[in-house]
Amino acid sequence: MRSGLAAAAAIIAVVTGFHAAIWYSLRPEGTAPAVTERFSSLSFAPYSRDVRHPDKGPPVTADQIRSDVNAVADYTRAIRTYSSTLGLDLIPAIAAERGLKVSVGAWIDKDETRNALEIQNAVALTKQNSNVDALVVGNETIFRGEKSAAEMAELIRSVKRQTNVPVTTGEIWNVWLDHPELVSAVDYIAAHILPYWEGVTAENVVDRSIDIYNRLRAAYPGKRIVIAEFGWPSAGYNRDGAVPGDIAQANVIRTFVSRAEALGIEYNIIEAFDAPWKSFEGSVGQYWGIFDADRHLKFPLSGPITEPTYGRTALLALLLGVALSLPMLRLQRMTASQAAFLGSAAAGVGAWTALVLDYWATHYVTGGNYVTLVISLALLGPLAMVVLYRIEELSSILFGRPPERLVELRPRGAPSRYPKVSIHIPAYREPPEMLKQTLDAVARLNWPNLECVVVLNNTPDPALVEPVRAHCATLGERFKFLNVEKMSGFKAGALRIALDHTAPDAEIIGVIDSDYVVHPDWLKDLVPVFEDPTVGLVQAPQDHRDAHLSPMHEAMNAEYA
């Protein structure tokens, strides 16, 4: 027993070692140029992870802004805002405390009352704060279809007359190519270049962005051009060839910053912080920050790039795999291949569970998402246990030792005596032809002293009853036919009724289903076992009657038997 446990434990250790090797070999790593200087600029939205939407909550506080400014001050030379209301007008003064330049934003949409307030506040901020070096009127307003290029050009000219800082608007790069009249109205082009939305792969995104920048330079020579938004999400859905991820985000941003600095390109990274409140943008809108929602830097700015939670997930997968492997230590007569198979299955379930938990731990989820998680685990957890249980059965068939026969069959000869056997067959709405084959098999048994009690229960259809009744009559008086049209207890109830009609001199009762075709020597082989007074029950698995019909039937029979 101890040697068997030791062998099983050794196999679990070996499987766990292979499992660990797989995790190690698949560990994601990346390399990219280091960010040696502070970023040129970061999009800055100082909302905590508890904010559901900036427009639907209280104004952001000075303390929150100051905390977030302190979080980014060591990593950037400037920040860009998108609105000048609801507390965001406090940003320039607080940013000045840490020496940060600010591109002030005025949010423009169809609400003209708010538009007027946004512009009024933004213009005032340019006059009150010397660290404000630009005013961005609107953000993708033309792209959203809320104003035309002509309307935005006129609005920008109006704002330029009210301030001395450069004035522009933020738009997707192709809007600038399509609207030269907009270019003539602004002091510089603030182009949003986000190849993720074009389905560009992470490997090609920087080249694509530089190419777009050069197209803008060629179209508008001499015009100052700023890449006002560039970034890559760390999570979310794939968009054609664009695949988000922690490693991809770090590679893309570090490579882009290196190229931009070398080429003298002005840029702004979107964005400083992950934005859980952007759940309305789908699964990707929340993950563009270089800091997570708790203000932790998501990737190193120099050196190797690694998945931050990968090691934790791998360790959890290994521990779960070992824990799920422990029940197999109770199995007796287990082979090495069987143990390896079971251990591998447990490791697979452990890895799946760890990956599911890692997803929920590293993504921003709503209350509804948590309800989904609880329901999913409630459904999938038992399913995983059922799968492991079925795999245990499969392993015993494929890799286990052949079953041991607990009863030594005696040489087939004439038994010393023939005790009477009463064979009970319960049936419920069964096809008559099938049941007749079962009865014929009983009639062919090499046992002279037997009776057969057939109990049809809850079967009111005469077409199912009368053929069986007639066949029992044909087979003779040894076959007792009972038709109980209404009864409770299902099969157990039918067997109780059969007991009431069992011959008083019957010493042994045999029970078979209505679709069993027993071997002629069934009783001849098993009845002698009851000569041992300690034996009260003998169970003999029955092969499927139709195993020969197809490979599927044969496989089902093999699994059952």
Kindly give the residue locations of the regions a language model identified.
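N-terminal membrane-anchoring/stem segments of glycan-assembly enzymes
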Residues: 327-415
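Cell-envelope/extracellular polymer assembly enzymes that use nucleotide-activated donors
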Residues: 419-422, 451, 456
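A conserved acidic beta->alpha catalytic loop
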Residues: 448, 456-468, 485-488
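Long helical/loop segments within the catalytic core of UDP-sugar-dependent glycosyltransferases
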Residues: 472-502, 506-507, 520-561
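Aromatic-rich peripheral "rim/lid" segments of glycoside hydrolase catalytic domains that contact
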Residues: 33-36, 41, 47-49, 53-57, ...
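Short, acidic, metal-binding catalytic loop of nucleotide-sugar glycosyltransferases
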Residues: 439-449
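The conserved acidic donor/metal-binding loop of glycosyltransferases
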Residues: 512-517
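Aromatic- and acid-rich polysaccharide-binding/catalytic face
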Residues: 104, 133, 171-209, 232-233
